[in-house]
Design a protein with these regions (language model features):
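Bacterial N-terminal signal peptides
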Residues: 9-19
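Acidic (Asp/Glu) and glycine-rich low-complexity loops/linkers
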Residues: 2, 21-131, 137-147, 154-166, ...
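Ca2+-coordinating acidic residues in Ca2+-binding motifs
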Residues: 212
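Bacterial N-terminal signal peptides that target proteins for export
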Residues: 1-10
Length: 270
């Protein structure tokens, strides 16, 4: 392997807002949007976030979902219309950033509106997350099904399976107790320490980097960017590959990659 896993530094560092991201979402008018929802007996949490930063953090022993939000807008009038919906719907805790459609501009010349959310949930609860734009970090949940528009997206700790559909921005996934499936538009994909298999169903551009996957690694369709895998417990398969290199080390099972990559890559097989 010629390259170290890019996500390692990310995992070791705290979740930081870059100066560029902060400038993008900073607005002269802000207001708190907080809520607490009883989570006793809840099986899952559903989050619909729009523009803004998002954290979903699993906490041991927690019996409530605690939401700490900050509404931001370039207009006081717009600010009052940014709402937080937090309620129990049967065995689901539902959280929504309610930003009226006519205010969903992303820091254009007229105005900006966003709602940053930090959501603390019972550790291991299943999560369904939909996010528009802005950086997202999810930690210590159960299974996860997520859709993300733009911005970096990280998952650090999921007891079950993880499925992510991502538009643009780097994607980091670590410490997963089940399978991982990804559909990605652009940006690097970094995966580490997966108990199950890792499948990239579709990737437009950007590198794919995986290490410590106990199951198989399967790339069904990759447009451009390098693919590098290390320490795969079962098979490694690339079904369709555009431009970019393929490197692999310590693959225990069968290797099946496009013909043009085989001769120069077979030496990487242990």
């Amino acid at each position: 392997m010629k390259r170290q896993f890019r996500g390692a530094a990310f995992a070791a560092a705290p979740f930081l807002i870059s100066s560029a991201a902060h400038a993008q979402w900073s607005s002269p008018y802000t207001a708190p949007r907080n809520a607490v929802v009883d989570a006793a007996g809840a099986k899952s949490i559903e989050v619909e976030a729009g523009a803004g930063l998002l954290r979903v953090e699993g906490k041991p022993g927690l019996r409530q979902v605690q939401v700490t939000g900050t509404a931001r807008s370039s207009s006081q009038q717009f600010l009052t219309r940014i709402k937080l919906i937090a309620e129990r719907r049967g065995d689901v805790v539902f959280i929504k950033a309610d930003i009226p459609d006519d205010e969903r501009s992303y820091n254009d010349e007229n105005h900006s509106a966003s709602l940053d959310l930090v959501i603390e949930v019972p550790q291991g609860i299943n999560a369904d997350v939909s996010d528009g734009s802005g950086d997202t970090k999810i930690t210590n949940v159960g299974s996860l099904d997520a859709t993300d528009g733009s911005g970096s997206f990280s998952v650090i700790g999921a007891a079950g399976s993880v499925r992510i559909t991502d538009g643009s921005g780097d994607l980091t996934i670590e410490n997963v107790g089940g399978d991982v499936k990804v559909n990605d538009g652009s940006g690097d994909i970094n995966v580490r320490n997966v108990t199950g298999s890792f499948t990239v169903e579709s990737d437009g551009s950007g590198g794919i980097y995986a290490t410590d996957v106990r199951g198989s690694v399967v790339v069904q369709n990759d447009g451009s960017g390098s693919i590098e895998v290390n320490k795969v417990g079962k098979d490694f398969r690339v079904e369709s590959k555009g431009s970019g290199s393929i490197d692999y080390t310590e693959v225990s099972g069968r290797i099946d990659i496009p013909e043009r990559h085989r001769d120069r890559r077979d030496r990487s097989y242990r």
